[in-house]
């Protein structure tokens, strides 16, 4: 599998500078659980975490200010398993994301071992970009 430097693309995320930096630093230090961040349009995003072996009750999602934290604490098995090969990792984790201003968590679902967290960017109308009409009239000072 190839790794690509996405930093030039991350610079285009207006309003997501903090998230891009946090993702880069998290990716360098955090290998579990694997996750994707999907952008469906300019205002809708989805974080998907692969959590095979976890139950919904093992997971906790908290939003404190702009810090979104997902924690997983799997239930300990009653009996010790003797592995011949262990390819699936089921271990406690804590993963944090720093969200941009005006981002809201709109929901979370856990289906088939995938945790989906939906995000929406709601920029107040007063802060949203406004289109300025260009007039044919001469400027006032000319």
From Swiss-Prot:
Give the protein name, as stated in the record. Answer: Small heat shock protein IbpB
Q: Which family is this protein grouped under? A: Belongs to the small heat shock protein (HSP20) family.
Q: Which domain of life is it from?
A: Bacteria
Q: Which InterPro entries does this chain map to?
A: A-crystallin/Hsp20_dom, ACD_IbpA/B, HSP20-like_chaperone, HSP20_IbpB
Q: Which gene encodes it?
A: ibpB
> Which species is listed as the source?
Enterobacter sp. (strain 638)
* Every sHSP domain range: 26-137
Q: How does the annotation summarize its subunit structure?
A: Homodimer. Forms homomultimers of about 100-150 subunits at optimal growth temperatures. Conformation changes to oligomers at high temperatures or high ionic concentrations. The decrease in size of the multimers is accompanied by an increase in chaperone activity.
Q: What does this protein do?
A: Associates with aggregated proteins, together with IbpA, to stabilize and protect them from irreversible denaturation and extensive proteolysis during heat shock and oxidative stress. Aggregated proteins bound to the IbpAB complex are more efficiently refolded and reactivated by the ATP-dependent chaperone systems ClpB and DnaK/DnaJ/GrpE. Its activity is ATP-independent.
């Amino acid at each position: 599998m190839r790794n690509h430097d996405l930093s030039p693309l991350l610079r285009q995320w207006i309003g997501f500078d903090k998230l891009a930096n946090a993702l880069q630093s998290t990716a360098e230090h955090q290998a579990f659980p694997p996750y994707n961040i999907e952008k469906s349009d300019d205002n809708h995003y989805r974080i998907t975490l692969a959590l095979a072996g976890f139950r919904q009750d093992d997971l906790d999602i908290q939003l404190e200010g702009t810090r979104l934290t997902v924690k997983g604490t799997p239930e300990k098995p009653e009996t010790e398993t003797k592995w011949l090969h262990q390819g699936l990792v089921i271990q406690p984790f804590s993963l944090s994301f720093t969200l941009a201003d005006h981002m809201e968590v709109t929901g979370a679902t856990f289906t088939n071992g995938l945790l989906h967290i939906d995000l929406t960017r709601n920029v107040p109308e007063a802060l949203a970009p406004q289109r300025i009409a260009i007039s044919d009239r001469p400027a006032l000072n000319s």
